[in-house]
Design a protein with these regions (language model features):
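Noncatalytic alpha-helical scaffold of FAD-dependent oxidoreductases
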Residues: 1-275
Length: 275
């Protein structure tokens, strides 16, 4: 009875709850995350220690593999469950956690090959802050700042530029993976190609990702946007198809759907000047 009344009050007065409790807590949480990111990017960053960090992961996995199979616990990363972009919350506290959350550095940018080399826990926000001042962005850049590039590569990611370049994992040039026996392999389309093609959608079940190379694209200072209303599902679908499949397709295609027969389609093109 009391529980039903409590949730009924929360529902009826949700604006007050959100404004009085949700917003302050969200602001504090966001501030803490930003300070944490600033610390990791400006103070704790040590890309030159990548090899040592990978060796540490290999050592931990090798020791796990040496335990008799009947006594082994399931293996997982030490990334906090609450940080996952998932509806599943696994009981990691009962599993064998591999310490690898320090793998969060941007390692290098190869401008000639248009590839950036990163560690798996680099976030979308972090890599964007690194690339934009240099005139580049990831070929597939999500709007979720705290999403990690490793998670997107091993699961799935797409964005408003995907009609040109495909899904996130289709823009991965190489994976560095520690296998269950502790060995380190580099998977590309030419080397360990079976593993390269199996890693997307695997959610970390085939090995621990310790590094990857991602395709980048050059950017311009501005994006010229065009907004087109649609007044039916057919019009909306046809217009989206036309834009995405055109020979001179815009760089970005997105839409906001307001109802069954009302939507606004947004298309954007890189521009050198503000228009």
């Amino acid at each position: 009875m009391f529980k039903d009344l409590f949730f009924d009050l929360l529902t009826k007065h949700r604006t007050l709850v959100l404004a009085g409790i949700g917003l302050p807590i969200g602001t504090i949480f966001d501030t803490v995350l930003r300070l944490r990111n600033l610390y990791y990017e400006r103070i704790a960053s040590a890309p030159q220690e990548h090899a040592q960090r990978v060796a540490s992961v290999q050592d931990q996995v090798t020791r796990w593999a040496s335990v008799p199979e009947a006594e082994r616990k399931p293996m997982c990363t030490d990334r906090k469950t609450w940080m996952n972009l998932s509806t599943r919350f696994e009981p990691k506290h009962t599993w064998h956690r591999i310490k690898m959350s320090g793998l969060r550095d941007v390692l290098s940018l190869d401008i000639e090959q248009q590839v950036v080399h990163v560690e798996p826990f680099v976030t979308v926000g972090q890599i964007t802050r690194y690339l934009l001042p240099r005139g580049y962005m990831l070929a597939v850049t999500l709007e979720i700042e705290e999403a990690t590039v490793g998670g997107l590569a091993m699961a799935v990611g797409m964005t408003t530029h995907s009609h040109k370049v495909g899904l996130f994992q289709e823009n991965v040039k190489a994976y560095e993976v520690v296998l269950a026996d502790g060995s380190l392999v580099r998977a590309t389309t030419e080397e360990h190609s079976d593993l390269f093609h199996a890693l997307p959608w695997s959610h970390g079940t085939l090995g621990l990702l310790v590094g990857l190379s991602l395709r980048v694209i050059p950017v311009k200072p501005y994006v010229h946007m065009t907004y087109s209303p649609a007044y039916s599902q057919q019009e909306y679908c046809e217009r989206i198809r036309e834009l995405a499949c055109a020979a001179d397709a815009p760089d970005f295609v997105e839409a906001t759907v307001y109802s069954k027969d009302r939507a606004v389609i947004m298309s954007g093109r890189f521009a050198d000047v503000e228009t």
